[in-house]
């Protein structure tokens, strides 16, 4: 709309255009409406989990608590019992919103590789799919998460890939990002701390992992294994990938068991 482009045929936009609101001096009639926000942070969405249905005036929190945000921006007084009709209306909107989205929950968001315009794809552990929480920040990665002391670990996460073209692919796996210049088994020295309520991730020591080898696991099968030497920064595998869906889960063999490779770079040779 802002660029003058036409809408793709059959495409349904979600929401309402704010283009008119962006015009200098515009006076736009803007009807009150409901919006939904939630914070799931789980693999499979849970109804009403950490949710809020919002209007200009009202906030319905977790489907149970109602606050008048204009008079009570701190959300201290729950008015649900005094405004049952408002709660009912906002719950009905959420139910409709959930019903529209629920059929998509079983769909996996896949990372595309093999596209002619993107011959190199970089992956990080943030996109692992697994039952337990993924190591999504440097605090996790520096501390070898999700390994636990005294417990033999097995790498249970995977990257969901959609291979667009059958062929031979180069898969480079790393413990540290390539920009670090660090070897797989090398400790990462802490950086300077920054002001804040807690210790910055960069101020933590990046632990050595004592990896003996790296293994390429694809669709639950271990295909190749290579030794990790003291100076090795990355391990490179070459393998044939067929067009379609795949689960990629390379790992390092460490004293505690299996530690997923936090970084991978996939390219066509």
Regions flagged by a language model, labelled:
Residues 167-169, 210-214, 260-262:
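Short beta-strand/loop motifs in extracellular/secreted proteins, especially
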Residues 1-71, 86-89, 104, 116-117, ...:
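C-terminal cap/loop subdomain of S1 sulfatases and analogous C-terminal strand-loop tails that border
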Residues 3, 69, 83-154, 168-170, ...:
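Catalytic cores of secreted or luminal carbohydrate-active enzymes
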Residues 163-206, 248, 252:
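A short beta-strand element within beta-rich, extracytoplasmic domains
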Residues 1, 54-85, 89-90, 125-131, ...:
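A short aromatic-rich beta-strand->coil structural motif
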Residues 141-163, 179, 234-237:
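Short beta-strands within extracellular/lumenal beta-sheet-rich domains
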Residues 253-269:
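Exposed low-complexity, polar/acidic, P/S/T/G-rich flexible segments that act as propeptides
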Residues 240-244:
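Surface-exposed, short loops/turns at beta-strand junctions within beta-sandwich domains
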């Amino acid at each position: 709309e802002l660029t003058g482009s036409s809408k793709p045929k059959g495409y349904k936009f979600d929401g309402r255009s704010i283009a008119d609101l962006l015009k200098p001096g515009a006076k736009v009639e803007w009807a009150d409406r409901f919006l939904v926000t939630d914070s799931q942070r789980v693999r499979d969405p849970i109804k009403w989990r950490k949710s809020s249905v919002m209007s200009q005036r009202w906030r319905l929190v977790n489907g149970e608590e109602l606050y008048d945000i204009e008079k009570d921006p701190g959300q201290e007084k729950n008015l649900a019992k005094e405004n049952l009709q408002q709660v009912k209306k906002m719950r009905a909107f959420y139910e409709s919103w959930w019903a529209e989205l629920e059929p998509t929950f079983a769909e996996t968001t896949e990372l595309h590789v093999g596209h002619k315009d993107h011959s190199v794809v970089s992956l990080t552990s943030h996109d692992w799919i697994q039952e337990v929480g993924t190591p999504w920040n440097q605090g996790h990665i520096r501390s070898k998460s999700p390994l636990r002391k005294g417990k033999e670990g097995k790498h249970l996460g995977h990257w969901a890939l959609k291979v667009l073209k059958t062929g031979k692919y180069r898969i480079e796996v790393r413990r540290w990002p390539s920009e670090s210049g660090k070897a797989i088994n090398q400790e990462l020295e802490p950086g300077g701390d920054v002001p804040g309520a807690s210790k910055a991730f960069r101020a933590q020591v990046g632990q050595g992992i004592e990896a003996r080898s790296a293994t390429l696991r694809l669709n639950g099968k271990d295909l190749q294994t290579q030794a990790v030497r003291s100076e090795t920064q990355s391990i490179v595998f070459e393998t044939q990938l067929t067009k379609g869906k795949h689960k990629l889960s390379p790992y390092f063999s460490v004293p505690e068991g299996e530690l997923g490779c936090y970084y991978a770079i996939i390219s066509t040779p």
